[in-house]
Regions:
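Short, charged low-complexity linear segments at domain edges
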Residues: 1-16, 75-89
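Short, flexible, mixed-charge glycine/proline-rich loop motifs
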Residues: 16-26, 97-100
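The −1 position to Zn-ligating cysteines in a subset of zinc-ribbon hairpins
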Residues: 28-29, 107
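Histidine-centered nuclease catalytic patch
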Residues: 34-106
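Short Cys/His-centered divalent metal-binding micro-motifs
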Residues: 34-41, 104-126
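Active-site-proximal or metal-binding-adjacent scaffold patches in catalytic folds
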Residues: 4-5, 19, 39-46, 130-139
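Basic DNA-binding region of bZIP-type proteins
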Residues: 11-12, 19, 112-135
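Short C-terminal domain-edge/linker segments immediately following a structured domain
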Residues: 53-54, 61-66, 118-123, 136-139
Length: 139
């Protein structure tokens, strides 16, 4: 995920080098689904949900990266939208200051969002609760 301007100060000065080292460790692929950084893929829908297809028609399990076979593009159920994969570095403990290699993982957009889903839900819930509490002060 891109670093929000308000969080930049939480990252070390050598973040670019740390990021490069994690991408190198991962072979420039998502450490979850194994999709390559910069690959152009289509995400499956319906019967093809939880899969992705590369430009060559190879279909992969979106959770493990296991190759499932090859299909014609016209036979693959998807939205028709192609996505350019951009690897980001996930902090497994959600703490940007903790840049230990074992706390960092190279993930594609889908895998990073899935990894962060529970944390994002908890943060949103806490934000709503805090806003409600502030609103109560002015009633």
């Amino acid at each position: 995920m891109p670093i929000k301007p308000e969080n930049k100060a939480r990252y070390p000065a050598d973040w670019k080098q740390i990021r490069a080292a994690i991408l190198e460790r991962a072979g420039n692929c998502c450490e979850q689904c194994k999709v390559a950084n910069g690959a152009r893929i289509a995400r499956g829908t319906g019967e093809s949900a939880d899969t992705f297809m590369d430009a060559g028609g190879y279909v992969f399990d979106a959770d493990t990266g296991t190759q499932l076979g090859r299909v014609r593009h016209s036979d693959y159920e998807c939205s028709g939208k192609w996505t350019n994969v951009v690897l980001t570095i996930a902090h497994l403990d959600h703490t940007p200051e903790n840049c230990a290699p074992e706390n960092l993982k190279a993930l594609c957009q889908r895998c990073h969002l899935r990894y962060d889903a529970q944390h994002h839900a908890e943060t949103a819930r806490a934000t709503r609760k805090a806003r409600k509490a502030v609103a109560d002060l002015f009633e």
